[in-house]
Amino acid sequence: MKFARSGAAVSLLAAGTLVLTACGGGTNSSSSGAGGTSGSVHCGGKKELHSSGSTAQENAMEQFVYAYVRSCPGYTLDYNANGSGAGVTQFLNNETDFAGSDVPLNPSTGQPDRSAERCGSPAWDLPTVFGPIAITYNIKGVSTLNLDGPTTAKIFNGTITVWNDPQIQALNSGTDLPPTPISVIFRSDKSGTSDNFQKYLDGASNGAWGKGASETFNGGVGVGASGNNGTSALLQTTDGSITYNEWSFAVGKQLNMAQIITSAGPDPVAITTESVGKTIAGAKIMGQGNDLVLDTSSFYRPTQPGSYPIVLATYEIVCSKYPDATTGTAVRAFMQAAIGPGQEGLDQYGSIPLPKSFQAKLAAAVNAIS
């Protein structure tokens, strides 16, 4: 978590639970939207919500909860960042009011049907938090590096083994790359970051990756380290190394980040709120109605120049109609706060504020929660 705010009390428990409570009582209504789309927060319902799930959402959730309690004094939300799988399980077991997840509900395991039984209505997957994944590197004397999908795939599967390989050098004219051996560093733990990074390699490499994607790194080369902290620490002490990190860790650790050449044009693209915002705005929805499941393959081969292609989309999984109306009212208010005032300064937490066009799509679904 980043910091505690004035006017609210924050406590982080050992289990990774965030509890943020505003001072004051009654209900309030506010309108805002860092992405540019304003919307009211209609406070009401039960006073304390419970949610759990994605650790990738943890920092953004602090901002969302802060926006909620500021908009609705006297209301709280308790979020336990215990992992996507645990969060979905607790939601399906009716132990929490909604779940945070790096992936939408999985039809192959019957999760949509189980959620419909739990809710008494269809559950909706609402993509709310978008975090770029950075390719980070440590090469002595090299401060800028351009990569594309095929070249990155060949690095991470061991096909390219030295930094001055002609395929890398061709993308970096004007930079004298050394003959240093490449040291690949990967996540040794199961990770949504690994899954999404490998989906990028699979989707953007024109067949050069050939390893598929999963929460376990499949490249077959390199050294593993646990978590973003572990990979970052090993990168910083290893000349010639390369890894992948959530953007917030790359910024926080002051790591060098590669710029990515995409299918949309020859110009390398860095991570910025604008470049990731273009990716989000161009996201294709393959869910039906207000179930906003994304086709993330559209991220990896963008058509709009200046779009950054490696982005992790995470979801809030909610009931479309809650058995208890007071819960539905409160969840709707929280989500209104999250996609409205909660977007302000979200990039300081490692996530990208929603662009106007996508914010409007999400608002229509959020406002329909009951």
UniProtKB/Swiss-Prot annotation:
Query: Mind telling me which InterPro entries this protein's record contains?
Result: ABC_phos-bd_PstS, PBP_domain, Phosphate-bind_PstS
Q: Which SUPFAM superfamilies match?
A: Periplasmic binding protein-like II
Q: Where in the cell is it found?
A: Cell membrane
- Gene3D superfamilies per the record? Periplasmic binding protein-like II (3.40.190.10)
Record note on disruption phenotype: No growth phenotype in phosphate-rich medium (3.6 mM Pi). In restricted medium (Sauton) grows better than wild-type even after nutrient starvation. Decreased phosphate uptake in phosphate-depleted medium. Decreased growth in infected BALB/c and C57BL/6 mice for up to 5 months after infection.
* Family listed: Belongs to the PstS family.
Q: Read off the PANTHER family from this record.
A: PHOSPHATE-BINDING PROTEIN PSTS
Any one GO CC term of the record: ATP-binding cassette (ABC) transporter complex
Q: Name one Pfam family in it.
A: PBP_like_2
Q: Which GO terms describe its molecular function?
A: phosphate ion binding
Q: Where is the lipid attached (N-palmitoyl cysteine)?
A: 23
Outline what the protein does. Functions in inorganic phosphate uptake, although probably not the main uptake protein under phosphate starvation. Part of the ABC transporter complex PstSACB involved in phosphate import.
Q: Which UniProt keywords apply?
A: Cell membrane, Lipoprotein, Membrane, Palmitate, Phosphate transport, Signal, Transport, Virulence
Protein name, entry field: Phosphate-binding protein PstS 2
Q: Name one GO biological process term.
A: phosphate ion transport
Which residue(s) hold a covalent lipid per the annotation (S-diacylglycerol cysteine)?
A: 23
Name the membrane topology term: Lipid-anchor
